[in-house]
Amino acid sequence: MECRLSDYNFEFPKELIASRTAGKGKTHILYCPKNGGERRIMKAPEIVDLFRPGDCLVVNNTKVIPARLYGETQFGGQVEVLLVQALNPSESGEARFEAKVHPGKAFQVGRELKIAGVRTFVEEVHEEDGNRVLRFEKTPAEMEEVMNKEGHVPLPPYIDRPDDEDDKKAYQTIFAKYAGAVAAPTASLHFSEQMLEDLKAKGVYVAEVTLHVGPGTFQNISVEDFSQHKMHGEHYELTKENADIINKAKRDGGRVVTVGTTSTRVVETIADANGFLKPQRGVTYAFFYPGYKYKLVDGLLTNFHWPKSSLILLVSAFYGRENTLEAYKMAVENKLKLFSYGDGMLIL
């Protein structure tokens, strides 16, 4: 199989990029029968009818942190940081983070800056990705308070507006529990509490995984032969309780439907050859593209993804390249909204 990135491009008018969400339970879903059959556009709550008792929905319970902070150099220059992940505190108990920074020249090792009003020191530069290790003159708990007060929602780069108060709720899913993501697992944004209640009442299991989505989710693939692409790592965890729920559903003949590429990444990373799971935590670098055979996932609910991205490749691995691009063409022709705050598709 040829791995040409240019084969996964599609055209779309810029006005279809959703800059705000329609609201939980108020989006549209393009239903794509996995084994053929006519695709059709449904209102999000209507997808409940497509599930059977005994099916299992797998969601990501990560919580987006207000990870974008602004500050200044000692000379008054404006700077911006995106906190990627918390690191072990310093010996004296100060908070340390790996961060993406701008402009890079302001963040030389040994430099002192003021970020969100906090004295900040540059400890390391990562040669590979340009990320910095920053030490803040606050404890981790104090730094969390600073972020909640001064931090901004890290909206995706293609949403061309500043974040505001609405985003604090809109960019958080109803499943969000464990802080650590710098991007939302956006497929879960389609679910309202009522939809969740209706699914459970129907006898659908709901299992949770945790994958802290990193900024690498928006990373462009820079090589035409995408098999040479080096995937970013993301921290994940699957508890015994949730592994048991998924395994029971599978064993009893239910369909396992992952909500989003992030949940998919976790269960396919962990699944054994027979598609069963054990509790596990770690960092996944898994990269799924056409040719990959899914071990566990029977259905996938996901948003429409950026052309030539690792995410559209993951979907194409599940649904096939031609099917995926045909579905995207139908979405564009019907003016469905695209990307993080947009509409979605259910392959089942």
List each language-model region with its residue ranges.
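A cross-family signal for N-terminal binding/gating loops and helix N-caps
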Residues: 1-348
